[in-house]
Design a protein with these regions (language model features):
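Glycine-centered short loops/turns at secondary-structure junctions
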Residues: 89-90, 167
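Solvent-exposed, flexible loop/coil residues
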Residues: 28, 37, 42, 77-80, ...
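A generic structural signal for short
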Residues: 31-32, 71, 92, 123, ...
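A short alpha-helix capping/helix-coil boundary motif
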Residues: 20-24, 59-63, 81-83, 112-115, ...
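Catalytic-core regions built around general acid/base machinery
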Residues: 78-89
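N-terminal helical cap/lid subdomain that shapes the substrate entry/recognition surface
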Residues: 1-77
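Secondary-structure boundary/capping signal
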Residues: 6-9, 54, 90, 94, ...
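Asp-based, Mg2+/Mn2+-dependent phosphohydrolase catalytic module
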Residues: 84, 95-198
Length: 198
């Protein structure tokens, strides 16, 4: 409980956490820190901003977060509708840098498992997006050709640049309308827009 630690605003804590989490995920993706360091440091650095330097507490919060996070069922608007639409026309797979032990629980809890044939995690493959090897592995696993495949992703570097470098068409899902200078052929802010493209 955050109030027990003297932290009055959960919103401020979450905002600070998200900043640290994003920076650490970038370092993890670049193989500059380990999975364990990512898990431990994101809460340690957040708590440190409040004058709390407690590694054991940070680790405890981190483990609890990893346990509870996949159980959340909140989806983007139109998720099920669009997946039902795509499922009739395409074979779908997931490529993720997320932790192996979390992904299957997350998909199962949110009722999405049945839509995807393969869940390809960077931990299993041994390389992370945007490394082209994970995209090549995915194509091979799906028995698919580059020119018949398309990647829909919400991370410009890991997903969009990664797929582009691997020769795969991409659609950038940018729900927060993040401003960027990149020349993206297909960019959407709402999943319902996929019906117009696919």
């Amino acid at each position: 409980n955050l109030s027990n630690l003297g932290l009055n605003s959960a919103e401020n804590f979450i905002r600070k956490y998200k900043i640290h989490n994003e920076i650490l995920w970038d370092l993890y993706r670049e193989d500059k820190i380990s999975k364990e360091e990512l898990r431990g440091k994101r809460f340690y650095l957040t708590l440190k901003e409040y004058g709390i330097e407690d590694e054991r507490l940070s680790e405890k919060i981190g483990l609890e977060y990893v346990r509870k996070s996949p159980l959340k069922k909140k989806l983007f608007p139109y998720t099920i509708d669009v997946l039902n639409y795509l499922n009739k026309k395409y074979e779908m797979h997931i490529i993720t840098n997320g932790f192996e032990e979390v992904q299957h629980v997350k998909l199962s809890q949110s009722g999405l498992s049945s839509f995807f044939k393969h869940i390809i995690t960077s931990e299993k493959v041994g390389v992370k997006k945007p490394n082209i090897k994970i995209f090549e592995y995915a194509l091979n696993k799906a028995k698919a050709q580059k020119d018949e495949s398309i990647l829909i992703g919400d991370d410009l570097i890991a997903d969009i640049f990664g797929a582009k470098n691997a020769g795969i068409q991409q659609i950038y899902f940018n729900p927060n309308k993040i401003i960027h200078d990149e020349n993206i052929e297909f960019e959407i802010n709402c999943l319902s827009q996929l019906k117009e493209l696919l």
